[in-house]
Amino acid sequence: MKKILIPVSIIAILLCASWKEDAKTVSPDRLFLADSGKSLFVTNRAGNELIKMSSDGQKAEQKVTLSSPVNAMTQDPSGNLWVVCDGNTGMMYELDGKKLSVQSKTKSGATPSDILYSPVSKSLWVTQRFNNELW
């Protein structure tokens, strides 16, 4: 398996450089891999966005704006991405893995902090940070 290591500072610089002039604030926060490590995603906390980077990490290819900042992401076997967002409008989103279009959304309270797909139980697990809950 080939490892690709891209320092976060380089991604932040490239993300800022590739951003359109009408964007006001870019705040790279979290990194996620999908498609067995072939797809790189970075979050823009200030813009409530999930951004798919090019495979070499040099430019932003796609983005989706969500209700609040992305805390975590996982992928199911069909390629759909599952994302939890925190804040007053905390949500769990199901996204089409290719188009980044929203397939479904579920209110999840204000504090979803992580999400994981379990291939054994074929289910999603979500933690609620301050509520001491595991869904």
Task: Identify the role of each PLM range.
Residues 1-4:
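Positively charged n-region of N-terminal signal peptides that target proteins for export
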Residues 6-9:
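Short helix-onset patch at the extreme N-terminus, typifying the N->h transition
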Residues 12-135:
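Predominantly soluble domains enriched in secretory-pathway, periplasmic, or organellar proteins
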